[in-house]
């Protein structure tokens, strides 16, 4: 999936400056060169450990520094996670993403995280986790457990980043992505529109992502969900056309990546979402909640997909995947499963 093209800030800005309809037309042409039109990859995201995060990301209701009314929860039991994954699979999801509100996971939690990955993978689902920063050994353990994707967003441009987060550096994020890639895990990384950034920052974010040694296989583009109690609760609303522009530019700059229409869909009408799909978005989070914020329910999404003639992209398992799933399923059936019910931290 690597690409030899190196994007400049000026090139990205030129795309943002194109007339809206011309930009959408180009993005749709690029999209059709690499993906089946009218297909959308569907993921489900579960918060496996909620709140009490020590970081200061100004957009996040899970930070312990802000009074948002969110009740913190310890790491879920493994069986609870597997039950949620099974429901997601039965509802049509092909990837199950597990997110924990940590700066980084503790080594004591790694066996439980490995069991979650193995159990979800045994169901035939792709697996994704977002756990914060990882050390080399933690990355290797997740890779050996069979983790398919790791999410670690860059959030915004390097220049604007310090206005949003101070508890980890931009380089920390890039280093984590590098470790994940070197371990053979696919990368999921994107950003947020509506933090107070300008067009230069949106262009800068996409330049950073597109110029990674290998661009992310999955690029989530989030619209800020404003939560009372966070420093960004009173930010101005994002102009839908500017959000759609960001989707289109991401599609053109990262033609082989899945561009995910991520957080903020609950605030979008059907017309805005339709234009996002036209602009090259071909992945969504499916289910009524994204970590702690609202998301359209499955029934609403299926109704919209029907109106637009969109089909859910089916996962094609590799021979290695099938063999690993069979092995993991056998291990889960024969193992003493008592530890699945006593995994809370």
From Swiss-Prot:
Domain Radical SAM core residues, every copy: 38-256
UniProt xrefs under NCBIfam families: bioB
Pfam families noted in UniProt: BATS, Radical_SAM
Functional pathway: Cofactor biosynthesis; biotin biosynthesis; biotin from 7,8-diaminononanoate: step 2/2
Record-annotated disulphide pairs: none
Annotated PROSITE patterns: RADICAL_SAM
Subunit structure: Homodimer.
Family, similarity comment: Belongs to the radical SAM superfamily. Biotin synthase family.
EC numbers, comma separated: 2.8.1.6
Cofactor note: Binds 1 [4Fe-4S] cluster. The cluster is coordinated with 3 cysteines and an exchangeable S-adenosyl-L-methionine.
InterPro entries recorded: Aldolase_TIM, BATS_dom, Biotin_synth/BioAB, Biotin_synthase, Elp3/MiaA/NifB-like_rSAM, rSAM
Cofactors demanded by this protein: [4Fe-4S] cluster; [2Fe-2S] cluster
GO biological process assignments: biotin biosynthetic process
Catalytic activity: (4R,5S)-dethiobiotin + (sulfur carrier)-SH + 2 reduced [2Fe-2S]-[ferredoxin] + 2 S-adenosyl-L-methionine = (sulfur carrier)-H + biotin + 2 5'-deoxyadenosine + 2 L-methionine + 2 oxidized [2Fe-2S]-[ferredoxin]
Function: Catalyzes the conversion of dethiobiotin (DTB) to biotin by the insertion of a sulfur atom into dethiobiotin via a radical-based mechanism.
GO molecular function: 2 iron, 2 sulfur cluster binding; 4 iron, 4 sulfur cluster binding; biotin synthase activity; iron ion binding
Organism: Sodalis glossinidius (strain morsitans)
Keywords: 2Fe-2S, 4Fe-4S, Biotin biosynthesis, Iron, Iron-sulfur, Metal-binding, S-adenosyl-L-methionine, Transferase
Name of the protein in question: Biotin synthase
Gene3D superfamilies: Aldolase class I
Residues given in the record as [4Fe-4S] cluster binding sites: 53, 57, 60
Residues the entry annotates as binding [2Fe-2S] cluster: 97, 128, 188, 260
Lineage: Bacteria, Pseudomonadati, Pseudomonadota, Gammaproteobacteria, Enterobacterales
